[in-house]
């Protein structure tokens, strides 16, 4: 098991690991509320990558990693990931205009 200190390196190596063997690669999140620690693990039974954090800002990055993995799983491992971000997907939803009754 390898703990990776840099978030960007963890994401890059995780995507490479998934693209190398998409059938057996899995992604696990574990959160311990009493410690406030989040551990992300990506493994393909040969190599195991781990990232540990206790920073709340990393939760937003975790959502982006989820979107990346969902895209890779749904569209295939050869998809271009340059357009995958959490903000762009959220902005495409139509905005609600009011709280009142529809007329």
From Swiss-Prot:
Main location group: cytoplasm
Subcellular localization: Cytoplasm
Cited SUPFAM superfamilies: Signal recognition particle alu RNA binding heterodimer, SRP9/14
Gene Ontology molecular function: any one: 7S RNA binding
Signal peptide: none
Keyword Ribonucleoprotein annotated: yes
Pfam families, A to Z: SRP9-21
Family annotation (InterPro entries): Signal_recog_particle_SRP9/14 (IPR009018), SRP9 (IPR008832), SRP9-like (IPR039914), SRP9_dom (IPR039432)
UniProt KW Ligase keyword: no
Subunit structure: Heterodimer with SRP14; binds RNA as heterodimer. Component of a signal recognition particle complex that consists of a 7SL RNA molecule and six protein subunits: srp72, srp68, srp54, srp19, srp14 and srp9.
Family recorded in the similarity comment: Belongs to the SRP9 family.
Protein name: Signal recognition particle 9 kDa protein
Gene this protein is translated from: SRP9
